[in-house]
Swiss-Prot record:
This is Alpha-1,4-L-rhamnosidase. It is an enzyme of class 3 (hydrolase). Its main location: periplasm. The active site is at residue 199.
Length: 487
């Protein structure tokens, strides 16, 4: 009798809930499915390069020291020609083009330029790029040696003024290239790229107009290639959504005027706590695609990231910053490399010693030479603002499949883990035994540790193809790596 009364009460409660519109929802744990088909050759994009080998150094007169043990570090020499500032005043002693007041003539002196190049080489490093950025201070003089208002104009980074005499600048660059070829050999110089300008669009790097710079680039590249016809030349702009983004216009102008470039560099200094600067699909669309993915882009050119840092703060002058925490650095860089592999970008030029995201770098270093496969993403994260995705890679020579996944959030206080289902279709029959191991980035210890190898069996209904399915819980500000070895 008591059971009948209890059942009656339950039925009345349910009827009341429906009458008043009360709906019960059984909570279902959200899951993100990331997958690729390794059996479909159309998903294969490119062989993976290690993109953290280039290091910026400003006027390196005392050699170079780079701590990272990974890869083969190369150097980008910044401001090698002079035009530098010291304690807010022009430092003419570093110039390679000078004005002699007594004889009232211009002359070249490549002693400091040679010291920089020799210093890099003697330190055991190759040179990736020489930046032809700040003109020597003497280029603020007209052809008669006269200065406007009889004083030099000084910017944050030194001489940001366009040369007063473009013809003199052209002849000077020819002398620079002749000196380099005669001193180090043509073969060595063809391995180095020459970057005309630095972070153009920033008034403290180039005070002239956009049109003036385009003409400056044309004159400079022509002078370089007159001496070294197959020299690699290019330039460096701000990111596409910045206030003074000239990159898109430069690409269109180059196409219309048949002006050559082998590469374009772009700066990228995202604040780690701003969603519009850390969501990779959005960032690529507005900062890089507007340069690289337009019809006028030279198909054989490469897009590089000539300055990069994930930053926490920036000083008022805009020339110094504080790095984001290590956990954010490591998880973010995996997502950044996903963007690089997907869109065929190359080379992250770093300041410092390359120690901001070492755990991620080691994992990324281990997949160089392997093949990147594009993938799909389905489902929603438990926390809407978590940015989660994965990199799928095939090591053909060793019959190993790698998967790297990351979880990033622009909110430093985010704590929500995400539940992932990682799937990959392989060229093996169902029931094939594979060995699996994984490593998870520990943000407290800033390290990764590997699990033991575990045997799994592939699944599926096809005769010669099957799927490996892996479930993982991925903390925010972390990344993981799976290795799947076919026996």
């Amino acid at each position: 009798m008591k059971n009948k009364k209890r059942l009656c009460h339950i039925l009345k409660y349910i009827i009341t809930c429906f009458l008043f519109g009360v709906i019960f929802i059984i909570p279902i744990q959200a899951q993100i499915v990331l997958q690729t088909d390794f059996t479909d050759s159309e998903n294969a994009r490119q062989n993976i390069d290690y993109h953290f080998n280039v290091f910026n150094r400003i006027t390196p007169l005392n050699g170079v020291k780079i701590k990272t043990p990974l890869g083969k570090p190369r150097v980008c020499i910044v401001r090698p020609l002079g035009g530098i500032v010291k304690n807010g005043k022009p430092d003419i002693s570093k110039d390679s083009y000078k004005w002699d007041k007594k004889s009232k003539t211009f002359y070249t002196d490549f002693t400091v330029l040679k010291n920089q190049i020799d210093g890099v080489i003697n330190s055991g490093y190759a040179i990736h790029q020489i930046v032809l950025d700040n003109p020597s201070w003497a280029f603020q003089r007209n052809k008669n040696g006269e200065l406007v208002a009889d004083s030099l104009k000084v910017s944050t980074y030194g001489n940001a003024e366009p040369p007063k005499d473009y013809n003199a600048w052209s002849n000077y660059l020819k002398d620079v290239l002749k000196f380099l070829v005669n001193t180090y050999g043509e073969e060595s110089m063809l391995k180095i790229q020459f970057n005309i300008g630095r972070e153009i669009g920033t008034p403290s790097h180039w005070s002239g107009s956009k049109e003036a710079f385009f003409e400056f680039y044309k004159i400079s590249s022509s002078a370089i290639r007159e001496v070294l016809p197959t020299a690699k030349v290019g330039t460096h702009f701000l990111w596409g959504s910045s206030k003074n983004a000239w990159g898109t216009d430069f690409i269109k102008w180059s196409k219309a005027n048949n002006v050559h470039y082998d590469f374009i560099g772009v700066s990228f200094y995202p604040f780690y706590n701003k969603p519009d600067r850390t969501l990779f699909k959005e960032v690529y669309a507005k900062d890089f695609a507007v340069i690289k993915d337009i019809p006028e882009w030279h198909k054989n050119a490469k897009l590089e990231m000539h300055e990069y840092a994930l930053i926490k703060s920036l000083n008022k002058a805009g020339n110094a910053f504080e790095n984001a925490p290590k956990a954010q650095q490591n998880s973010f860089i995996v997502g950044l490399m996903k963007m690089f592999y997907e869109h065929n970008m190359q080379n992250v030029f770093q300041w410092g010693q390359g120690t901001n995201f070492e755990a991620a770098q080691e994992a990324l270093f281990s997949i160089q030479g392997q093949t990147y496969y594009t993938s799909t993403k389905n489902g929603k994260p438990l926390l809407e603002t978590n940015d989660v995705d994965a990199i799928f890679i095939k090591d053909v020579s060793n019959n190993i499949y790698n998967i790297m996944a990351y979880n990033y959030n622009a909110n430093p206080n985010a704590t929500t883990d995400e539940h992932l289902n990682l799937k990959a279709k392989l060229d093996v029959p169902p029931g094939t035994k594979v060995k699996v191991r994984f490593a998870l980035y520990n943000k407290e210890k800033d390290t990764m540790s590997w699990s033991e190898w575990k045997e799994e069996a592939t699944q599926g209904n096809e005769k010669s193809k099957s799927v490996i399915s892996l479930n993982a819980e991925l903390p925010v500000f972390s990344f993981l790596k799976y290795e799947v070895k076919v026996q």
